[in-house]
A protein has these predicted regions:
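Conserved functional hotspot residues or short segments at active or partner-binding sites
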Residues: 29-139
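Charge-biased, low-complexity intrinsically disordered regions
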Residues: 1-16, 29, 84, 126-151, ...
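C-terminal and late-domain segments of enzyme folds
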Residues: 1-47
Length: 159
């Protein structure tokens, strides 16, 4: 479950988030991805004490790419406190940078990019277009998250 929120963000693109596989939201890929290249691009961002990553070819049985071989990665969290959102944004950025002719964001019925709905703003779109730095956005989100956590501390049942 810790990977679900980040997985939904990846699902806002044409990358399979592993639905219809034994490990949905832990498996990511697409037919156009070179899994060696993709793995190498993501490896520097993985804290291997908290998360394992490996290359993975898979065939989804539902949603995107049903019955097609997808190439990408599989993740295995080693703890239940890993913040998966930054890595999920790096998955999107790596795909956008490595495969600009193939990578696409998914539009909602109203024409708005689904990634903007999932993340709450158009900032990730700007990152994927090369108009904003991903590290800057992640720093902003971290600061906003801390402010929210402080403001809601007294109302939380589970800590």
């Amino acid at each position: 479950t810790i990977c679900y929120s980040g997985g939904c963000a990846v699902g806002a693109s044409n990358i399979s988030e592993g639905r219809g596989t034994p490990h949905p939201f832990l498996t990511y890929g697409a037919p156009y991805i070179d899994m060696d290249e993709f793995y190498e691009a993501l490896l520097p961002w993985v804290d291997r004490e908290k998360l394992l990553i490996r290359k993975k070819a898979f065939t989804p049985s539902e949603r995107k790419y049903i019955g097609e071989i997808c190439y990408g990665i599989e993740l295995m969290p080693l703890c239940d406190t890993y913040d998966f959102i930054p890595l999920s944004m790096r998955i999107l950025k790596a795909a956008a940078d490595l495969y600009p002719n193939d990578f696409e964001l998914v539009k909602a019925a109203d024409g708005q990019m689904h990634i903007s709905r999932v993340t709450g703003s158009h900032e990730m779109e700007r990152v994927l277009e090369g108009k904003k730095d991903l590290d800057s956005l992640l720093t902003e989100w971290d600061a906003q998250s801390k402010v929210f956590a402080e403001a809601t501390e007294q109302y939380r049942i589970y800590r």
